[in-house]
């Protein structure tokens, strides 16, 4: 499919530089969960969709503020949106109604990293709909002074055997063990090989594409610990050329991995991706603080959820 720039719509202008990452107040959101409920007051044709996120003036049947107005009332500076690139677990042209079987997934099963998810568009069969409507959503949030952090999952794909990576260069884009089996440190059946030149370039080009063409204000890296520090350094450098205040943060869990510990983007290696004084560096979700407050997520019971 070839789309003209006119057909894809305009992204508008970037928001002004934000400041320090530590000044951000971030709410996490799934597009469908946020707007699918029939009682939300959001227009029926926009429920569960990109455009439902930015419909204003909505209230529930009981008169409570909902949708965009509710999000604004939280006073957040950023909304971190769960994966909104194309993912594999939902049939985009199937039944997407409220409570429909198989219509909901958080999207941590990537297919096409650089294509918006079609199930969030008004017409998944029309390629331009998902592009223009995602841009409208981002512009609508920006208009209301809310910046957008995109949740990205470059550490694994939905199905390695059928993925375009393996069809392009079989065996190159993924990690394999000594027995020739796919490495599964992610727990998702396959791990991408960020340390290889073209996978690294793909990741850097991808975030650059989203930042330039959709004016994305930040990126949250899923299982960032499985991505090497050199790749993350290049991600930061590429985004700095667009806007040094773009937020980059991620899950720097110290996981079992075939990678050398010194190369993993984990908290002990945070100094390798820290701010150089001209940018925001790369931030980490801190499981050490979490576990200090509530105990280990794997072995301790707690009434606290963090």
Feature locations, PLM:
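Active-site capping/gating regions of soluble enzymes
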Residues: 218-219
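Tryptophan-centered motif/residue detector
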Residues: 8-11, 210, 253
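Active-site-proximal helices and loops of the catalytic beta/alpha 8
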Residues: 101, 108, 223-304
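The feature marks proteins involved in alpha-glucan
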Residues: 1-28, 34-48
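Active-site flanking residues adjacent to catalytic metal/cofactor-binding acidic residues
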Residues: 27, 150, 250
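Extended hydrophobic/Leu-rich segments
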Residues: 8, 304-305
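Substrate-binding/active-site clefts of carbohydrate-active enzymes
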Residues: 32-62, 66-214, 232-243, 247, ...
């Amino acid at each position: 499919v070839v789309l003209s720039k006119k057909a894809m719509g305009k992204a508008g202008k970037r928001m002004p530089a934000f400041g320090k990452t530590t000044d951000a107040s971030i709410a996490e959101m799934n597009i469908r969960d946020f707007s699918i409920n029939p009682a939300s007051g959001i227009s029926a044709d926009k429920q569960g969709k990109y455009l439902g996120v930015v419909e204003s003036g909505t209230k529930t049947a009981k008169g409570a503020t909902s949708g965009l107005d509710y999000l604004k009332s939280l006073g957040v500076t950023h909304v971190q949106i769960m994966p909104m690139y194309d993912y594999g677990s939902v049939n985009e042209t199937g039944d997407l109604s409220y409570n429909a079987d198989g219509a909901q997934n958080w999207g941590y099963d990537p297919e096409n990293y650089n294509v918006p998810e079609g199930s969030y568009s008004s017409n998944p069969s029309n390629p331009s709909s998902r592009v223009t409507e995602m841009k409208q959503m981002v512009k609508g949030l920006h208009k209301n002074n809310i910046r957008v952090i995109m949740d990205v999952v470059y550490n694994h794909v939905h199905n390695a055997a059928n993925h375009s990576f393996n069809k392009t260069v079989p065996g190159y884009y993924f990690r394999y063990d000594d027995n020739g089996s796919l490495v599964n440190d992610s727990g998702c059946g396959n791990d991408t090989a960020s340390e290889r030149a073209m996978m690294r370039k793909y990741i850097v080009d991808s975030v650059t594409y989203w930042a330039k063409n959709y004016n994305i204000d930040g990126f949250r890296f899923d299982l960032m610990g499985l991505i090497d520090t050199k790749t993350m350094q290049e991600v930061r450098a590429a985004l700095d050329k667009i806007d040094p205040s773009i937020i980059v943060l991620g899950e720097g869990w110290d996981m079992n991995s075939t990678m050398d510990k010194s190369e993993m983007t984990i908290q002990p290696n945070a100094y390798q991706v820290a701010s150089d004084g001209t940018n925001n560096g790369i931030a980490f979700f801190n499981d050490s603080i979490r576990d200090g407050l509530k105990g280990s997520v794997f072995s301790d019971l707690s009434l606290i959820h963090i």
